[in-house]
Amino acid sequence: GSATSLSYYNKPLLLTYSGGKDSDVCIELAKRAGIPYEVVHSHTTADAPETVHHVRQKFRQLELEGIHCNIVYPTYKGERVSMWSLIPKKLMPPTRIARYCCNVLKEASGRGRAIITGVRRAESVSRSSRGALETITAKKSDKVVFDLAPDDQERMYFDDNDAKRRWFEQCKMQGKISINPIIDWSDQDVWGYLRECHTEINPLYYCGFSRVGCVGCPMAGRRYRYQAFERYPKYRDMYLQAFARMLEAMVRAGKPATKWSTASDVFDWWMEDTNIDGQLRFEEEQTC
């Protein structure tokens, strides 16, 4: 992977860092391998405060070790955006099906680079059949798969963690080569390795989270999302404000909502979206 990055792009590997346990494993692996690498984090604007702090703390440590780190802030149509300003622009809430937030808030980093991700098959049932190598393109008809298992699906690097993720992937549309070194690791492998390395992890793992990600992510279960909003009520308020602006924008665009009258109506509908395993969720009990 490192040789490919240097020969193909003339740049070191770029490790995409989310602030979660899998990203921490990838950093430890890169350190131990002694390869040149850089680290990038996509600031989604909807991550929990603990995650934001953990990322910045990790980057300070890495910079002291001589590792170049960069935080990428999201833009849409040439303008800086947040989750809250993006929703009115899109005239709809982000859902499990319409995951525009992933594309705008997470997918911009790593263009024209060979990237390392912490994608794992064990993170969800749907990831279980990912293979070894694939080329990812904007059009399904242009896709080339270097694997025994056929596939015709498009990929989203940071959130499309379905069963067909590979160890090595190439995205022609975004100019990315994606390397997933822990694709076959189990949860036990991850936690065991982090303990062995004495790695400082995101404090949310000590507070009842089994995974970390955007607060309110529609890929999480309804019960867990409500628990997240109990912990972070200001995020709920920001979603409500964004939904209110969205309804106003829909009227201005000549597309008034038919199923919602208020921001609360939108929020209640949005929270009923059912769960897909593999994203932010809480355990049964919170400990802090």
Segment roles from a protein language model:
Residues 1-288:
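Nucleotide-activated chemistry modules centered on ATP-dependent adenylation/adenylyltransferase
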